[in-house]
Amino acid sequence: LVGTTFGLVTFSNDFAQPEEIKFYRNIQNRNNPFSLTGNDFMHIYKNSHKDIYILTFTGGVNKITSRTLLSENIEFQYYTEQEGLGSDMVLSMIEDSQKNLWIASENALSKFNPETEAFENYSTGFLRQKMNFSEAIPTINARQQLIFGTDMGFLEIVPEQMKKSDYVP
């Protein structure tokens, strides 16, 4: 898989000579509800269930649902602001120990449960930090904290301690 600024490129690694490589390109097609929702790729992520997610700069998150990647008609399930994602301008993703996916956008962090397809969104105001997330690849440290790159350095979070308030004024 190769993410570009103009779609997804796939090819088989089963070849003897480079000239034998057949490339497939998938791009956004507004007439096809199963195509990509954006063409400018920021990150490609495979979770522990081997699901592949494509993060686009203006089209949110696209999960590959096709069985084969060697096609110009790969099908995707998309997650955008309409489905509850904090922002369609997503930058990076990482999975925590509970199998939730954490998605960084420029000024928000979204927790996504792939089983229920539910989102919890945390703005940088909630995090009490004046910062913007970067496209740096997140990681997990030895204490199981998620580490995200920001324009101010990095941010460590403990996923189990991230809770939305139930308070209703």
Q: What residue spans do the PLM features occupy?
A:
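Carboxylate-rich, polar loop motifs that coordinate divalent cations or form catalytic acidic clusters
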Residues: 1-169
